[in-house]
Amino acid sequence: MSVATAALARTPFTGNATTGELTHWRAVATEVAQSLAVDALERDRKNEQPHAEAQLLRSSGLLDLLVPAEFGGAGGHFETAFEAIRILANADGSIAQLLAYHYFNQTGIAFYAPAKQQGAWWERTVAHGWLWGDSVNPVDPTLLLTVEADGYRLNGAKRFSTGSGVGEVIIVNALVQGGENDGKVLAFVLPTDREGLELVDDWDYLGQRLSASNSVRYSNVRVDAAEILGEVTEEPVSTLLIPGLQLAFANFYLGIAEGALARGKQLLLGRKNAWFLSTAPTYSRDVIFQRTLGELKARTAAVAALVEKLGRAYDLLIAKAGDVTAEERAELAVAIAEAKIVSTETGVEVANRIFEVTGTSSTSNDVGLDLYWRNVRTHSLHDPVDYKKIEVGQYFLHGEAQPISLYT
């Protein structure tokens, strides 16, 4: 039952997305986003588990975008997945988060499992239409695996387990106690209906209310040897999962900013009068409001250019698989940290300042413009952006990368 630790050329991803691939999945994501936009505010207020939304993602084909074609998936690229996340975030930040985490939980198959075992995992996720959640929050105490015949027993608890409330499976990391894998951290996959696995309905936060990010408790949960993906190591290619998730966050914040701008523009154009001291005939013709929107639009466009460039770079580095070096991994991680910084600050600023051009009436609960701010403000606290600035500054000054972690 020993888990191999040798470096493996694990990822099946190659090259960059074609124009045809990007065009197709943009259209799919846009259609899903339009459907979500119809009642995003109403669903947010109900704060129910997003089972219908998960089914919408499943029926659209988005869940299998990154699954290699030879195993029944779409054979898409991360650049395409990042764009899909961004487009969904225009309309519904919660469901964009659900999709983003699904992608990087599901592709744990490629990052952790030996190459010869990946095909069976890919085929199972396609056959069963799995939405993948997770239970890996590193801030909480480490989950523990104790050895028993043909497997393990899992105990502990994790908060902020995104997708666990609606996903069919979750990816979990835990420390092994005893046996030949003693001291190793293993990544494994559990069905969410496993005996002893309790989904705690405690996700009631300011924003991202439909991200199904509840807590999970484990009481002597059986983990079969066949459910183990592999060991969590510091192999450069396997640790690219975390910068990839951080880049998904950057696209997510950008998408929320773009959604807030679009909604703000709509509201401003609908204001037929003007401020009594203005010489403009309408609010939209007032240069003060034009200046504000121009500034926010320019900042958003700059973030877009950066994350699009990094999406392509991420695909190219992933394609190198086991040949990825620690230096290449560090360089891309820092570049993504830069994007995380500017996307966080731009997302929060846009979602906040959009009210300056839409006026008091836009704070009405019927309008729901606050949904953008609540969502980006909540998720942007995932990991402190100041530490991303330190990460970038340290690398810029001394060429020193941060230690590998579930945040860096």
Task: Set out the residue ranges of the language-model regions.
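Intrinsic disorder at enzyme termini
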Residues: M1-E21, K389-T408
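Glycine-rich phosphate/cofactor-binding loops in nucleotide/flavin-utilizing enzymes
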Residues: T358-T408
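Glycine-rich beta->alpha junctions and the first turn(s) of the following alpha-helix
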Residues: Y205-A301
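C-terminal helix-coil-helix/basic helical segment that borders enzyme active sites and/or dimer interfaces
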Residues: L41-D44, A301-I341, F355-T358
